[in-house]
């Protein structure tokens, strides 16, 4: 029987749901490696050891986080669940990425991106998969052990598959959503892909009823999981909260003519803002999706360009980092240090491992 996390139901029920406490591995300070939108071509995959060696050789890295997109938006999906397999598909790609993840010495947390499921219907991905079938395949491979990370040395975490609200038993399907605590910081991942949160029609396999149901169920579950993370942070008197997801929910390219739009993120962003305001202490959001490294405070000023997009509450304590990804040079991973003894808690730098992902890494 699944253990339930009664987030938003009652404090007593929430306590019972998390009565089996997962002990943090570090009391005050830890360092993690974060990257996403990788590998975006065969050059990066063939040179995966450069990334692996760079991360594995850092003695302070205690965890690895991949924020989604395990191939580019012009590479095929796996035609999961389709027989015979779609000719243009690459059925073995996900397994190759899984094998690479397992070579990291530290626990690996991965949250799905749009390219490996949401966008598989697109012609630029060779119409090589049906979104829901591709998501099911991602879950069956990367999340085969609910409540455990990937990596050579795995780690137990809270998974929404086991810790879900009893009022919403269907949330158990979101095995990819995780929570853990380390260095007086609560970490949470949610499945929030690009392409306007799966808001784009599925081309030749479009089923609007199924797509809209998918968006609603997953986004609502993501919000409940986010609430659960902040509830845990309050109860444990955490110094900070870190959220990992794929989508750049303020991407200006998505708002430009012909862009994907950003409206399907608004409900989640508003809840994130509300939770950050209530929490008061530092909150860090890490995303990929738009590929170029940057950091900002997108909700600090409601009258700013980013503040106007979702009309959310002002949350000056929310910092956002977009990790370097795709084939942008140089190939980098983010070295994020969390030190609960410092006022800002977070510090980071980029570590290069590939000179030019498009041509030669060395």
Predicted regions mapped to residue ranges:
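His/acidic metal-ligating clusters that form di-metal
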Residues: 54-63, 181, 186-188, 204-299
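Structural recognition of the beta-strand scaffold that forms the well-ordered cores
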Residues: 31-36, 62-72, 102, 107-112, ...
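Extended active-site neighborhood of metal-dependent phosphoesterases/phosphodiesterases
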Residues: 81-218, 300-337
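Active-site environment of divalent metal-dependent phosphoester hydrolases
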Residues: 41-42, 72-75, 112-121, 195-200, ...
